[in-house]
Amino acid sequence: MKKLNIGDYNDILNEVLNDISPTEVEKKELKVFSDKIIAKIKDISKKPVVDIIQVGSTARDANLKDDHDIDIFLRFERETDRDTLKESGLKIGKEVIDYFNGKSWVEYAEHPYVSGEIEKFNLDIVPCYGIENCEKIISAVDRTPLHNEFLIMSYKNKNLSDDIRLLKKFLKGLGIYGSDLKTAGFSGYLCELLILKYGGFLTLISDVKTWKPTKSIVLNEIYEMYDLKKDHVFSKFDDPLVVYDPVDLNRNVAAALNEENLCKFIFYSKMFLKNPSKDFFYGFDKKITDFLNRRERGYLLTLEIKRPENIVEDVIYPQMEKIQKSINKLVKEHDFEYLRYQNFADENTCYLSWEFLVNELPSVKLRIGPPVYSEPGVMNFITHNEHYFVKGCNVCAYKTRKYKNIQILFEDIVNGKFRKIITYPKYVCPENAEIRLGTFVERT
């Protein structure tokens, strides 16, 4: 394998590359199999299908070892109605996978598409509309073939595959690879754009160490594609990282990335450059979690809520986050402090977990009122509080807590006593949930 000219980091990064790069045999198998699939689709498809394109990392030699995912997009004429697009896409997808004796099923995004398994290969056959750069999309996936065309054109005479693989593996090691709403990290497309912008993995992270939230990136190719001047004013986005999409300048490719994961990327880029190690590339986030959990725990509590059937992760995770933040506000109002909280969903159950500093508070709390010289405020305070007194310069009172035990508070949450206070998303309802004490469910 070709050595990377990266000085002191050379040995470590090439060791990682030897672990994660597909062999020439693997690449050939992917190419031969993909060609068979495309040939069969061409054989059975007709108008309004106007083009068949393989997209994704395996189409661009940007995949990791043992990644056998093949993404095929069927581009339909713009005038095609959605029902025809949906029905034709599903029919073609199922027929192709059946022809190769594979197993197929329907997945759902904005519209349904066919996924399948044929031998060791995972296949998605996705219908979309044929559009041009910066044209208004008709369905959410219409840009994907344009992304593929842009990257292939931009990669000419550039050898970036190894650097893309290193970045993906680095982000996987940190637990921040993936643009799904559960992960809120970096998409594969974003990784490829970053490597294209900076020309290599090490060059990228050397710059990343200086980043701050609100960082904005415009690829040089964008100015050439659209004949823009260097002082062109681009659309504004309120996101931690902004990377303008070359095929749609009104879209931020990094929109799914949250601030914490951006800051992890910044911090661990600094750490890797200071103390280079293979450890960063292999389950580093799990090692950090395990290390931090080797301590005396606070009071652990988990709500287990039945997960509705057929609700995808990109729906269920935002709803878990929404209700957990609403509960967080309630517990803070009752003076309970938590060290951390987390949510996770498996096939059947949603888990909302907390680690509290204490589970029991004193029966009495100090309520601090306005300064004694604030006449209207003082009179209002003493009207609503018995046994008032002056502490420092404020009028104060002792109040009996309504909830001194966190378990009792959560029992009332589960019994529906806060229905008018807590935000109830459509699919994650805390009523009739099971309370598990001494348990904190980590994300996997």
Curated annotation (Swiss-Prot):
Binding site for Mg(2+): 69, 71, 124
A GO MF term: CCA tRNA nucleotidyltransferase activity
Cofactor: Mg(2+)
A single BP term in Gene Ontology: tRNA 3'-terminal CCA addition
EC class: transferase
Pfam families on file: CAA_C (PF21133), NTP_transf_2 (PF01909), tRNA_NucTransf2 (PF09249)
SUPFAM superfamilies: Nucleotidyltransferase, PAP/Archaeal CCA-adding enzyme, C-terminal domain, PAP/OAS1 substrate-binding domain
Catalytic reaction(s) noted: a tRNA precursor + 2 CTP + ATP = a tRNA with a 3' CCA end + 3 diphosphate; a tRNA with a 3' CCA end + 2 CTP + ATP = a tRNA with a 3' CCACCA end + 3 diphosphate
Residues annotated for CTP binding in this entry: 57, 60, 147, 168, 177
Record-listed ATP binding positions: 57, 60, 147, 168, 177
UniProt keyword annotations, A-Z: ATP-binding, Magnesium, Metal-binding, Nucleotide-binding, Nucleotidyltransferase, RNA repair, RNA-binding, Transferase, tRNA processing
Gene3D superfamilies, sorted: Archaeal tRNA CCA-adding enzyme catalytic domain, Beta Polymerase, domain 2, CCA tRNA nucleotidyltransferase, domain 2, Poly(A) polymerase predicted RNA binding domain
InterPro entries, per the entry: CAA_C, CCA-adding_arc, CCA_tRNA_nucleotrans_2, NT_2-5OAS_ClassI-CCAase, NT_sf, NuclTrfase_I-like_C, Polymerase_NTP_transf_dom, tRNA_NucTransf2
The enzyme's E.C. designation: 2.7.7.72
Stated role: Catalyzes the addition and repair of the essential 3'-terminal CCA sequence in tRNAs without using a nucleic acid template. Adds these three nucleotides in the order of C, C, and A to the tRNA nucleotide-73, using CTP and ATP as substrates and producing inorganic pyrophosphate. tRNA 3'-terminal CCA addition is required both for tRNA processing and repair. Also involved in tRNA surveillance by mediating tandem CCA addition to generate a CCACCA at the 3' terminus of unstable tRNAs. While stable tRNAs receive only 3'-terminal CCA, unstable tRNAs are marked with CCACCA and rapidly degraded.
Other remarks on this protein: A single active site specifically recognizes both ATP and CTP and is responsible for their addition.
Family affiliation: Belongs to the tRNA nucleotidyltransferase/poly(A) polymerase family. Archaeal CCA-adding enzyme subfamily.
Subunit and interaction comment: Homodimer.
PANTHER family: CCA-ADDING ENZYME
Protein name per Swiss-Prot or TrEMBL: CCA-adding enzyme
Organism: Methanococcus maripaludis (strain C7 / ATCC BAA-1331)
